[in-house]
């Protein structure tokens, strides 16, 4: 990631979450989220847009945390593009991805009329600042250790993390 930033690439940090409540079955939630993620990644429009913007790869981490509303499954994704995206391109991309995530969650049976409003507020969050130090601090949950090795450890470690606030309002307490 550090090399990508040095080469002038754009890093876009996205959090995807799904509606949930205390009584939900964890395995069912995870299966439905997996279905939504598969639907999210499919489609010619997605492929064309990502190619047009110079998409080179991503890092995805599934993170189930537990809070007052039960299990809170969500993913953190870092999208990497081989050039600096314009503000207009970033806005178009994040708008498209947010809409695509909602449609995928509806199709997977996760979003209903009852929980749609909450999903609209918490279901998708994009940090478009490109602040690599902020990203590393958040992903490692360690204000003192700002290292790429710490980020790599965070992205690959399956251990659950403590409840907390995320980037740009990601509420890991499970309000979505």
Model-predicted segments: where are they?
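Catalytic residues for metal-mediated phosphoryl-transfer on nucleic acids/nucleotides
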Residues: 1-75, 79-176
């Amino acid at each position: 990631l550090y090399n990508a930033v040095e080469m002038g690439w754009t890093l876009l940090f996205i959090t995807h979450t799904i509606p949930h409540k205390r009584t939900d079955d964890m395995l069912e939630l995870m299966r439905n989220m997996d279905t939504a993620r598969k639907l999210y990644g499919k489609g010619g429009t997605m492929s064309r847009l990502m190619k047009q913007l110079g998409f080179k790869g991503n890092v995805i981490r599934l993170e189930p945390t537990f809070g007052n509303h039960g299990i809170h499954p969500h993913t953190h994704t870092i999208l990497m593009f081989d050039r600096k995206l314009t503000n207009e391109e970033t806005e178009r991309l994040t708008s498209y991805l947010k809409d695509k995530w909602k449609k995928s969650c509806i199709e997977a049976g996760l979003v209903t009329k009852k929980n749609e409003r909450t999903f609209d507020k918490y279901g998708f969050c994009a940090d478009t600042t490109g602040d690599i130090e902020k990203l590393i601090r958040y992903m490692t949950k360690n204000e003192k250790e700002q290292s790429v090795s710490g980020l790599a450890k965070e992205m690959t470690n399956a251990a659950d993390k403590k409840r907390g606030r995320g980037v740009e309002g990601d509420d890991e307490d499970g309000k979505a």
